[in-house]
Amino acid sequence: MFVHLRNYTQYSLSRGALKVREIVEYCLKNNCPAIGISDFGNLFGSMEFSLSCVKSGIQPIISSNIRIEDENYSNCYLLLIASNYLGYKNLSRLVTKSFFKKKNNSFPSISISDLNNNNEGIICLSGGKDGVLRKTFEKFGGEKTSKINSILQNIFRENFYLEIQRLDRTNSELRFNDFILNLSNKNKIPLVATNENYFLRQDFYESHEALICISEQTFIDSEHREKISRNCFLKSPSQMIELFSDIPECCQNTLNLAKKCNILLEEKKTQLPRVVTEEDEDSLLKTQALQALENKLKYDPLKDKHKKEYHDRLITELEIIQNMGYSGYFLIVADFIQWAKKNNIPVGPGRGSGAGSLVAWVLTITNLDPIKFGLLFERFLNPERVSMPDFDIDFCMEKRDEVIKYVQKKYGELNVAQIITFGSFQARAALRDVGRVMQLPLTQVDNICKLIPYNPANPVSLKELVNDDTQIKKMINNDKNLRTLFEISSNLE
C-alpha cells in the first residue's frame, strides 16, 4: 500500500493546482485509506480538507511545507506533519512565527532552532527536491548533510523520516538518492517515498505551467524560467509502488506514518470574547445605543422631527441583535473603532450590508444614516441568517497595526487572529490571463471574452459554455490555439 504525503492544493497560492475535491475523488477511486496535503508555508486548506476527507471516510494528514532560512540555509524546506492536535497547535505556531519573521518582500520562514521548542506531536520529513538535506548535499556534500541530518534526528527522534523521490532520474537526483539510502541504513532512519504533486493528471501539466506564468508575469514560451517536472502529478498507488519496487519498505512506511496521525479538525461554534462590564451585554448595548441616538438627534433638528421613526427602528434592531446573541460583537467593534478615531487613526465610513444598521451608525461603527439613505437592516442581520454577520471596516494602511495591537492587548493575543479572503478564476479572467501568458493577440482574446455571459450571481463555467454555445464550439474546433486556451482556462477556473 502507498499513501501520498505531498500534495500542493490551490491553497499553495499560485503554485499548487490540486483542488480538495479532486484529492478526495482520487482517494475514493483508488481506495486510498489516507492522504495528506502539504501546502507551502500555510494551513489555509486544513479545515476544508479535513471535513471533506472525513465526510468520505478518508483519513486526512495535515502538514505544511515550511521554508527554512538562517545563516546556514537558504530557500529550502522541511515537511512538518501534525500527528495529533498538539502537533497541529505547534505547527500553527511555527507557521505564525514564519509570518512574524517575514521582512519586506521576503518569504515567510523559520530557522532550525525554532523547531526545538515546537516539535512535540510533529512528524518531520527531510524534504524532497528543495529539502534541507538535498540543498545541503548539492552545495556542501555528504559530510555537512550528515551533520544536519543528526540535528534533525535529535530534534524529532522517532518522528523523523528521510524522503526519497524519483521525479526525473537526473544525475543530481540519483547521487542524492544513493546518499539517502546509505544514510537511512547507517542510522536506522525510516525511509518514505514521496512525489511532488502539483496537479491531478499528467495532461494538466500545461495548465499548471500557465498558472505559474500568470503568477510570475512571464510567458509559457519563455526560455529562462524554471520549470517543474511533468511527473509532478498525482500518480496511482500502484504506479508509486512500481516506481519504488526495488525498495518496497519506503512505500509501506508511508502507510505506517499515516497510522501515527490522528487528527480530525471540526468546525466550532462562534465564540466571541466577553465584554468586561458590570451590566450584561444586552443592557449595555441598549444603554449606549439609546444615549448615542439622543446625541445624534439633538444636533440635527431635521432628524429630531422623525425621532419616533429612529427610536422604533433602533429598538427593533436591538431586539434582533440581542435575540441572536450579537450584542457583545457590536460592543467590541464599536470599542476599537472609537479608540481608533480618538487616536487620530482614519477609519472608513463603512461598506457592505453593515451600513444598513442604525445601531452601527449611532455607535459610530459606520458614518451613514441608514434611514436617510433607505438602507435595510435585514440585509445585514435577520433571524433567518445562518452565518455570522461582519462589518467591512477600512483603517488607514499605515496605522492599522496599531488597532490590531489594541485589540490583542484588550482581549488577549490568543483570542485575536487575522483572516484571509481567497479569490478564484472566473471564466473571463481565466481566459484573459491564460491568453496573455500564451501571447495570443489581445484583440482575439477580448473578442472571445465578449461572448462569455456576464452573470456574477450565477456564473457559467467554460466547460458548460463549450458544450452549450455552438459559436464558441465552432471557433475552438477551427483554431488549435483557441482550443488550448479553453482547455487550460477551464482547468484553472
Task: Give the label of every model feature segment.
Residues M1-E493:
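Alpha-helical scaffold/interaction cores of sigma-54-like transcription cofactors
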